[in-house]
UniProtKB/Swiss-Prot annotation:
Its EC number is 2.3.1.-. One of its GO terms (molecular function) is N-acyltransferase activity. This is Putative lysine N-acyltransferase C17G9.06c. Belongs to the lysine N-acyltransferase mbtK family. It comes from Schizosaccharomyces pombe (strain 972 / ATCC 24843). InterPro entries: Acyl_CoA_acyltransferase, Acyltransferase_MbtK/IucB-like. The lineage of its organism: Eukaryota, Fungi, Dikarya, Ascomycota, Taphrinomycotina. SMART domains: AlcB. It is found in: Cytoplasm; Nucleus. Keywords: Acyltransferase, Cytoplasm, Nucleus, Transferase.
Length: 334
């Protein structure tokens, strides 16, 4: 097994010669992870990492192990001789065992760490269930800003989500909405001016915003992200939770269609929404009931079809995934 894995700043070639030995190399840097069956720990051996932060080193090591073992359900324990001298700068949310001199985390917790994938500041408001509480939302992101970025080893490409900027992205929205296969489900074909007005209205709506998906910086998809309580799906989502999220999706660039890509971007947009606000416990969708291909993709990514219901303009499937389901199953596809 051999593929590329990125730290926050550098690409490393990962080689797994056997299940108990993982090697990461980049220029003069070399990281060796060796599994010790007797202690159930991974030993870290470093060379050339003097200029890399301890948190970045540990995250790279954990990431590599979870790439090689994507369904691992046990705690991963890293044994590193230098960890005691570095503990003062340790900010990664991992368990530090001072007595044993090791750090540990499980896969479910690891994928809920926002950095390095989230580029925008995540909400840090605490979860509250008080009656008549003021609903506090993160502000909509600045148009054109990168929200999420992650290297995908299976594709050898970088996936990113960018907040829609009308001047920069209107051309893609206009082209994609006028494709017959998109118009069939979205019903938003129209002129340049009509689409400009549509996106301007969206930009002024505090409950929703547009997102452009890119592979290697090439736009391929459009998403609309929304808060469920303020959306038209709310009456059907009872009992809805204050911080439920949802999204609409279309893949407009035909070069980036295919069953090998859908699980990647579908799990990644879900990942982004759960990371964006730790109070979010559910992500919901309402695809048209005859969009069976997309519904099946959602089910394959551990979404549940809860019911069918009628909007004025369509019959829809109510699709749901909880935070626990997402992170306890696979998390984002790699």
């Amino acid at each position: 097994m051999s593929f590329t894995v990125w730290s926050k700043t550098e690409p490393f070639k990962l080689s797994a010669v056997q299940e108990s030995l993982i090697t990461l190399e980049h220029d003069n840097k070399r990281l060796l992870l060796t599994y010790r069956e007797e202690s159930k720990t991974w030993d870290i051996d470093l060379n050339g990492f003097q200029d890399m932060d301890v948190n970045e080193i540990l995250q790279l090591a954990f990431l590599s192990i979870f790439y090689v073992f994507p369904t691992l359900r046990t705690e991963v324990v890293l044994q590193w001789a230098n960890i005691e001298s570095q503990k003062g700068t340790l900010s990664l949310p991992v368990e530090y065992n001072e007595l044993e001199g090791n750090v540990s985390i499980d896969r479910m917790s690891f994928w809920q760490i926002p950095s390095p994938w989230m580029y925008t500041r995540c909400s840090d408001w605490p979860l509250s269930y008080l009656p008549n509480q003021v609903i506090r939302r993160p502000k909509c992101p600045k148009p054109g800003s990168t929200l999420y970025e992650r290297f995908i080893p299976s594709l050898n490409e970088t996936l990113s989500f960018v907040s829609l900027d009308i001047e920069q992205h209107l051309q893609y929205f206009h082209e994609w909405q006028n494709k017959p296969r998109v118009e069939y489900f979205w019903n938003e074909s129209g002129s340049w001016d009509q689409h400009h007005e549509y996106l301007t209205t969206l930009q002024n709506d505090p409950h929703s915003f547009g997102v452009i998906g890119c592979f290697n910086d090439v736009p391929f998809a459009y998403f609309e992200v929304y808060w469920v309580p303020e959306d038209r799906i709310a009456p059907f989502a009872q009992p809805w939770h204050t911080h439920d999220r949802g999204f609409h999706a279309l893949v407009g660039n035909d070069k980036f269609r295919g069953p090998h890509r859908v699980p990647v971007w579908l799990s990644s947009i879900t990942h982004m929404l759960f990371l964006d606000d730790p109070r979010t416990q559910r992500v919901l969708l309402e695809p048209r009931i005859d969009n069976s291909k997309f519904i099946n993709y959602l089910i394959e990514e551990n979404y549940s079809k809860r019911l069918e219901f009628n909007f004025p303009h369509k019959r829809a499937a109510f699709m749901e995934i909880t935070r626990n389901m997402f992170f306890s199953c696979l998390g984002p596809r790699i």
